[in-house]
């Protein structure tokens, strides 16, 4: 259309007599047979005062062809190019402002008429733009047809998935029931296996405790009369109960339940549990009789002298606030080393049996393992079906979203939905994924920064689909969240052409796409080369 408008003046323009600097559209105001009325109506003057180099009208309309009025306008006819208004102050200023040179009629300089050359270049540009529009619109129609077909296919696929979903849901429920049925004997067999193992552990532990108690009884029974007396018990001051470092006769008698002595059976039942953790053997632990192999059986702990009560949490916090970590470590070591004045030297650290295979639960028997394998197979089938159902539900959601999305009046922008486009500048790589997000990352590497996620179409009311808005990107330091407006321009290819930041944290991106090409106007043939000017 612009090309036609440019060509029409060349074909049909006729010379109309008018004062210098007056346009064809205003020539009827300048009738030399009548007085001239200022265009703003401020005054009327004789016509011979028009262009007399003296400003009579407030709006400068009486001096369109001179520089007398600072607010006047001079019209450049520019035949062969585009007409132009310039300020009257530029008339005869020694600078060629009109391509036809008519503004310098009395300045003494000669202006070359460049209008035809400019018109030729302008027409070439307009022709190229028209070609881009025609080709882009042709591609746009293909995109529209492609989306119609793709949309129909997606709708069919959606119907198939929705039908398949019901079948898969039923399958999942069947497999869930089979899994639960298979897990019942599995759990029962595993519980029985664990219970038998724990019972064996308890028996082994009881046996070991009796052996330890018997060994301690033999050590305490100095006269080997088959009983432990108060005096024999007093030979072990570590059994002190009042913290004075010695086991008094009364304390020993209390430990023996008020009796003067006690045989081995009563010693295990009544005394051993009370002294077990304090008692220190008089022989090395290696001289104990070896324990029978049993799971989860540990060597008895050797007795240690009484330790001071550990500090409370509040005391610990106070110490942390007042002292350094190194001081606390030293205090802990000191507190562990404190002993009553009359206490015997500290005993070696208690030794425990090293972990062995017997300490671990034994492998499942063949029948239990068979139950486990069957249940695991049922679980695997159920989980696989459940994953398939979740994948199908995700596919259904994606299809529903894509089918219902607003891709333009005829779906011409749908092809952008699954694409991303990049623009590399000196500092950043900008990435646009239409209908999803915009981001930037440093060219030399680094994490991407979100410039916004899809918000809405953002063009004016008469051209809604000419711009996109992406919002709620990464927040700027002490500023708003980043956002991006994407202007859609007509082009034969889809490419990001520019990215700028006109306002802080607000970006402007331009995307060329055939989908933005308008329908070109019909082409009217131009008959011959009738340039009457």
From Swiss-Prot:
Q: Which residues belong to any copy of the EF-hand domain?
A: 208-243, 244-279
Q: Which residues bind substrate?
A: 48, 52
Q: Which residues form the signal peptide?
A: 1-13
Predominant location of this chain? endoplasmic reticulum
Kindly list every residue the record annotates as glycosylated.
71, 481
Superkingdom, taxonomy of origin: Eukaryota
The subcellular location is: Endoplasmic reticulum
Q: What are the disulphide bonds in this sequence?
A: 38-57, 55-69, 76-98, 96-111, 99-115, 420-433, 476-505, 490-517
Task: Outline the segment boundaries, as ranges, of region: Disordered.
Answer: 284-363
Q: Where is the MRH domain?
A: 418-519
Residues bearing Phosphoserine are: 23, 88, 167, 388, 395, 439
The record's annotation in Pfam families points to: EF-hand_5, PRKCSH-like, PRKCSH_1
Which parts of the sequence bind Ca(2+) 1? Answer: 49, 52, 54, 56, 62-63
Q: Where is the composition biased (Acidic residues)?
A: 312-336
At what positions is N6-succinyllysine found?
A: 165
Question: Which cellular component terms (GO) are annotated to the entry?
Answer: glucosidase II complex; intracellular membrane-bounded organelle
Does the keyword Glycoprotein feature in the UniProt annotation?
A: yes
Residues where Ca(2+) 2 binds: 93, 95, 97, 103-104
Recite the UniProt keywords alphabetically: Calcium, Disulfide bond, Endoplasmic reticulum, Glycoprotein, Hydrolase, Metal-binding, Phosphoprotein, Repeat, Signal
Identify a single GO molecular function assigned to this protein.
Answer: calcium ion binding
- This protein's pathway: Glycan metabolism; N-glycan metabolism
Any GO BP: N-glycan processing
Q: Which InterPro entries match?
A: EF_Hand_1_Ca_BS, EF_hand_dom, Gtb1-like, LDL_receptor-like_sf, Man6P_isomerase_rcpt-bd_dom_sf, MRH_dom, PRKCSH, PRKCSH_N
Its annotated function is as follows: Regulatory subunit of glucosidase II that cleaves sequentially the 2 innermost alpha-1,3-linked glucose residues from the Glc(2)Man(9)GlcNAc(2) oligosaccharide precursor of immature glycoproteins. Required for efficient PKD1/Polycystin-1 biogenesis and trafficking to the plasma membrane of the primary cilia.
Q: How does it assemble?
A: Heterodimer of a catalytic alpha subunit (GANAB) and a beta subunit (PRKCSH). Binds glycosylated PTPRC.
Quote the protein name from its UniProt record.
Glucosidase 2 subunit beta
Q: What organism does this protein naturally occur in?
A: Bos taurus
